[in-house]
Amino acid sequence: MAKKVIKVVKLQIPAGKANPAPPVGPALGQAGVNIMAFCKEFNARTADQAGLIIPVEITVFEDRSFTFITKTPPAAVLLKKAAGIESGSGEPNRNKVATIKRDKVREIAELKMPDLNAASIEAAMRMIEGTARSMGIVIED
C-alpha cells in the first residue's frame, strides 16, 4: 500500500545552499522531517546549478520520510542572469533596464519547458517575453 501523504511543502532555495536555518528549518521541522538529510540531498542534487534559486516541492509522508522534486529556476531569475542585471525595473513601462536577444529567450523557454504549461516552444517564448516585459527588459531580434 502507498504511504499516506501528510504535507506538501513548497520552497525556493538557492542551489547548493540549503541549511537548517529559516526558511528551510521551520518549514520542515513542523512536518517532522530530518532537516539535515534533506539539506544534504538537496545540496548534492543542485550543486551544478550554483547561483540560481531552485523551487522545490517536498512531499512528507506519515512515517516522516520524504521525497522532493526540484523544478527549473523561475523565469525572472534566468532573465536577470541572461541580462546581467541585479534586479528588474521598478517602473517597467517607463524605465528599461536591459536588452536581450530573442535567441536567449528561446534558450530560457527551452530550459523552462518541462515546468510551463505550453504546447509549443513559441508559446513558452511568449510567456518568457511577458515576464521580461514586466521586468523592464527589452527583447530584440
Swiss-Prot record:
Q: Which SMART domains match?
A: RL11
Task: Identify the GO cellular component terms for this protein.
Answer: cytosolic large ribosomal subunit
PTM description: One or more lysine residues are methylated.
* Protein's GO biological process: translation
InterPro entries, A to Z: Ribosomal_uL11, Ribosomal_uL11_bac-typ, Ribosomal_uL11_C, Ribosomal_uL11_C_sf, Ribosomal_uL11_CS, Ribosomal_uL11_N, Ribosomal_uL11_N_sf
Give the UniProt keywords, A-Z: Methylation, Ribonucleoprotein, Ribosomal protein, RNA-binding, rRNA-binding
Return any one Pfam family short name.
Ribosomal_L11_N
Recall the GO molecular function terms of this protein's record.
large ribosomal subunit rRNA binding; structural constituent of ribosome
Q: Supply the NCBIfam families for this chain.
A: L11_bact
Give the UniProt family note: Belongs to the universal ribosomal protein uL11 family.
Task: Write out the function statement from the record.
Answer: Forms part of the ribosomal stalk which helps the ribosome interact with GTP-bound translation factors.
Subunit relationships: Part of the ribosomal stalk of the 50S ribosomal subunit. Interacts with L10 and the large rRNA to form the base of the stalk. L10 forms an elongated spine to which L12 dimers bind in a sequential fashion forming a multimeric L10(L12)X complex.
Q: From the Swiss-Prot or TrEMBL record, give the protein name.
A: Large ribosomal subunit protein uL11
Its organism's taxonomic lineage begins at:
Bacteria, Bacillati, Bacillota, Bacilli, Bacillales
